Amino acid sequence: APFNWIQPTSKNDSVKISDGWYACGYDVYMAHEIAKKMGKKLKVVKVDWDGLLPALTSGKIDAIIAGMSATSERKQAIDFTDNYYTSNIVIVTKKNGKYSEASKLEDFSGAKITGQLSTIHYDLIDQIPEVKKETALEDFSSMVSALNAGKIDGYISEKPSAMAVVSTNPNLKYIEFEDNKGFEFSQEEIAISIGIKKGSSIKDEINEALATISEETRNQIMDKAVKNQLAINN
């Protein structure tokens, strides 16, 4: 997904992590901007998705910049900054499949749909009438593989990740819904924010840094991430 990935080279303004690998993507670019404005040196630590909250609360990392939304459940365990990206929610499906012309949630009635483990995306599946909710999957590559193999009919994603997937999988497409025809959620639930330890003093510092990065600049950084991911995958 354009939010973050690892690669074996230092191209595209990536940051070295460990074992000769480099982290890249929107999260990394934004982390670099924030660290620069805070006068800090950026260090990126690779942590599995389910290990992010424990890594933060144990002090292994200072902040989670990993495409994470500030859900009410997560807020019970950690604090969040202001958002650093807001996106629409879409469904990725096969371009020539049964649901390729869908335009509203009801059109996915009876479809086998999944989402990423421990995300708002997976919870939103319940809003589709008579849906066949499949087991949550670990990451986007797993969901794409399941979709291509016919194990699922679609998966829920934020738009930038869907754009990146479709650009490298021409047999897939994403369905973007018009107002009142798609998922119901609060902007707070889908806004991507930075997770920090409860009571951490860096919250205000990060928010001050974020306030200086305009919406236009954030969109330019996302465009750069999508473009660079496409270049890596090709």
Model-derived features: where do they sit?
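Alpha-to-beta junction loops
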Residues: 39-41, 58-66, 111-112, 148-161, ...
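Extracytoplasmic small-molecule ligand-binding "clamshell" domains
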Residues: 1-68, 76
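A ligand-binding cleft/hinge motif common to bilobed small-molecule-binding domains
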Residues: 51, 67-77, 124-127, 141, ...
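Ligand-binding clefts/hinges and TM-proximal coupling segments of bilobed small-molecule sensing domains
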Residues: 120-137, 174-178, 207-234
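Short helix-initiation/N-cap motifs at beta->coil->alpha
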Residues: 26, 43-54, 100, 135-149, ...
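Periplasmic-binding protein-like
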Residues: 86-93, 167-210, 230-234
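Flexible hinge/capping segments at coil-to-helix
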Residues: 12-13, 94-112
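Ligand-binding cleft/hinge of the Venus flytrap
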Residues: 4-18, 31-40, 120-140, 144, ...
